[in-house]
Amino acid sequence: MDQLITPAIWCDAAADEAARFYADVFREGSVIEQVLGYAATVSIHGFQLSLINGGDQDAPNPSISCILNFDPLLFGGEDQARAYLDELYERLSGGGVLMELGEYPFSPRYAWVRDRFGMTWQLMLTDPAGEPRPFILPSFMFGGTNHANAEEATEAWIALFDDAHRGALRRYEEGGPMEVGTVMFTDFTLRGTWMAAMDSGAFHDFTFTPGVSMIVSCRDQEEIDRYWTGLSAVPEAERCGWCVDRWGVSWQVIPHNIAELMADAATREKILHMGKIDLTRL
């Protein structure tokens, strides 16, 4: 099945280098699309990740990370899953370690790291007896001005997108670090893509930025209109198919053939001057 929502990492003039890095670091990694100097798409164990060249004003931060699910069933057993987790811990931690590799109440082996391009990754050994999940899940952390909004936001997204439903939902209880009832962890699908969210268990002074955005691939103008109406909440942020929702998450609502459209200079110039993309004007 085609991946209809794709995370996009804003790179400081390093998209080509980042694409080669991810293709090399992961055992099943490859560059599947590339416009040198502008953007690239990599496949990581079948999951697509987009890389966009830009400046340094919107670096990724941990508000949107990717969970790497080391389910022993995906890797031929627990020993193999642990070995691959440890391998990626070494290779993906070039930008620093947010949570040290070790045992935690929610996982026997876990770490949260930042790679040298600023993207953060949560490496987690999971229980093979649990509900199956894919290897990669984009994860939203609601902190700062967005604290305690995880449930509200995910409910709204699930209501908006097709092929969407909630999976697990675990809340903070008495004696925990956050208010009772706020979201400790939840996962859900949007257009068939598994994602996760949580209310931050500690104070952070960062929140969502365009450093990591979500690309929504649309088949026609009707889909563009529907998702744009449901997502865009900051008029001044509307540009070239980009919009920002009321929690500050950046979305790119674009036609499925955007690469083809942007290859034509006249069409590209029109798109660059649009907010919401209007196919009837191209």
At which residue positions do the language-model features occur?
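N-terminal beta-strand motif that seeds the catalytic metal site of vicinal oxygen chelate
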Residues: 1-20, 25-35, 100, 122-175, ...
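Structural motif
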Residues: 4, 39, 63-65, 96, ...
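Conserved beta-strand and immediately adjacent loop positions that scaffold enzyme active sites
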Residues: 6, 39, 109-110, 137, ...
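Vicinal oxygen chelate
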Residues: 11, 15-16, 24, 66-112, ...
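Conserved short beta-strand elements that form part of the metal-binding/catalytic scaffold
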Residues: 29-63, 121-123, 171-206, 251-256
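Generic structural signal for secondary-structure transition and capping sites
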Residues: 31, 47, 94-98, 236, ...
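N-terminal basic, Ser/Thr-rich segments that initiate or prime the first beta/alpha elements at protein or domain
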Residues: 115
